[in-house]
Design a protein with these regions (language model features):
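Conserved SAM-binding loop
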Residues: 18, 72, 267
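C-terminal accessory regions
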Residues: 358, 373-487
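Short, solvent-exposed amphipathic alpha-helical segments in soluble enzyme
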Residues: 88, 282-286, 484-487
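Conserved pre-motif I regulatory segment
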Residues: 2-40
Length: 487
């Protein structure tokens, strides 16, 4: 398909005339897609309300209509779900598509970079500002540098290419000053031919939004490096944003939970300490929770966990084998029904691991136990960002109300040594370590309540009702990080 035909097909999917910036971005995209250079890459940077989502949606619909293969990816499960809703086709986490498990070691599974068997495929990655490249998380996944691995994966395929979509005004990954995946210079360093464009003009449909009006003003402060005073948020004249006096917060949160539910309401705050205060206040004063943890509570995973999904895959495989043996043993049924029917979720469709930031709803609290100086519970959990997948797992309760992001190093060491005492009858150290790494209490999920979260945890998500708590601020506390956070 030539440039003009592809451009025409995309315009047909818009439903309204594109803005000049969208039209320019479209020109760049069709040049990128028709470039014969196998190492072409494109960056689509767009601020809030500039039509980035509608443009990417039109691109996806067009490519599917003309039978061009496309794969949608995002850094987190929540972001992938939003990308899927906006585009009308399935989206996956980057980790799920580019890594495969090499070995399971209890605390940290080892994931190698997968072979790219895709051909002639466009990989579209949304929320690319979240893609890190410092390897702060260790080397559990590939090289430990997500951007490196993503680029290596895509361009080892035959005639595959990459489109990175994101907002450079958002918070960069932890430990980085800017988002490397949105930097043309960074991508050129990989030997790639970079196409890039920026959307800055707020589209007409968004101009009546107070959220986007204020986000645009804050983004302009970032763009022009004009961070000399605290931003003045405008509330008057808009129906989608308002100032919330503290005295009204409890009633307002209760109304939100009633109108849109716990899953679609969030409080975004600046620190784990303040998130902890909000979570306790919401549970006690809004939801009337009296127990430490109850059915209906919303939780967030705060440390990657590989054990429980590996156990789930084993159980699924065992049940499927058992069902096959049962059918084969009944010769009449085997002849009448040669195919084993099962409602089991295929093991390859469940999450590879539970990631830091994943949310879960407590469906049932079935057992509590105090062991090794810590508190545990067995829970039935439902994961709204993974098609309401249900999983029974052991959870560590001590992290629920701690001010630390997860168990501290000293606490992790304490738990390890206490559990090790139960395996002293195993003489060989290697065998003993293997047994500990398979212990359900050593691998208990570390969780916090998910009614209030920090901005990094919320990034890439989408909620119907959002409460933003900036805390007490003075001019002396004004920093670029704060402005990015507020944006």
């Amino acid at each position: 398909m030539n440039i003009e035909e592809l451009k025409y097909q995309i315009l047909q999917q818009f439903g309204f005339p594109p803005t000049p910036e969208q039209a320019q971005a479209l020109d760049v995209f069709v040049q990128f897609m028709t470039d014969s250079n196998p190492h072409a890459v494109m960056i689509l940077r767009g601020s809030a309300g500039t039509g980035k989502t509608s443009l990417s949606g039109a691109i996806v619909r067009t490519l599917r209509a003309v039978r061009q293969k496309v794969m949608l990816l995002a850094p987190t499960g929540r972001a992938a779900k939003v990308f899927s809703l906006n585009s009308g086709m399935p989206a996956y986490t980057i980790h799920r598509r580019i890594y495969r498990e090499k070995a399971f070691a209890g605390v940290d599974g080892q994931f190698n970079l997968n072979d790219n068997l895709y051909t002639d495929t466009l990989f579209m990655v949304d929320e690319a500002s979240m893609i890190a490249n410092l390897g702060l998380g260790g080397t559990t996944f590939g090289s430990g540098c997500l951007l490196d691995d993503l680029i290596h994966f895509v361009y080892q395929g035959r005639n595959d290419r990459l489109l990175l979509i994101g907002d450079k005004a958002q918070l960069p990954p932890v430990g980085e000053e800017e988002s490397p995946a949105l930097s043309a210079a960074m991508l050129q360093g990989y030997g790639l031919s970079v196409y890039e464009c920026d959307l800055n003009e707020v589209v007409r449909q968004s101009q009546q939004s107070g959220i986007l009006f204020n986000a645009t003003r804050i983004r302009q402060m970032i763009t022009h490096d004009d961070i000399t005073q605290l931003p003045k948020i405008r509330f008057s004249g808009f129906s989608d944003i308002r100032e919330m006096p503290g005295a009204e917060l409890i009633e307002a949160l209760g109304d939100s939970y009633h109108q849109v539910g716990l899953v679609d309401t969030i409080v975004v705050t600046r620190s784990n300490k303040r998130a902890n205060i909000f979570n306790q206040g919401i549970r006690n004063m809004v939801l009337d929770r009296e127990e430490e943890l109850e059915s209906g509570d919303m939780l967030m995973i705060v440390k990657n966990n590989y054990y429980w999904m590996e156990e789930e895959r084993k159980k699924i495989k065992e049940r499927q084998l058992s069902e096959e043996r049962k059918v084969k043993s009944e010769k009449f049924n085997t002849l009448a029904n040669p195919t084993v029917q099962s409602n089991e979720v295929p093991s390859h469709e469940i999450p590879a691991f539970l990631a830091n930031g994943d949310r879960a709803k407590v469906m049932k609290v079935s057992r509590r136990i105090d062991l090794y100086g810590f508190h545990f519970a067995t829970l039935l959990l439902k994961f709204p960002d993974y098609d309401n997948y249900e999983l029974e797992a052991t959870v560590l309760l001590d992290t629920l109300t701690s001010e630390a992001p997860a168990l501290t190093h000293d606490q992790q060491e304490q738990l390890f040594h206490k559990i090790e005492e139960d395996y002293q009858d195993i003489p060989l150290k290697a065998d003993r370590m293997k047994a500990i790494r398979q212990d359900p209490y050593f691998n208990a999920l570390q969780v916090k309540f998910a009614y209030a979260v920090t901005c990094h945890k919320a990034q890439g998500g989408q909620w119907s009702h959002v409460y933003v708590d900036q805390g007490y601020m003075t001019d002396e506390m004004l920093t670029p990080d704060y402005i990015h956070w507020l944006y």
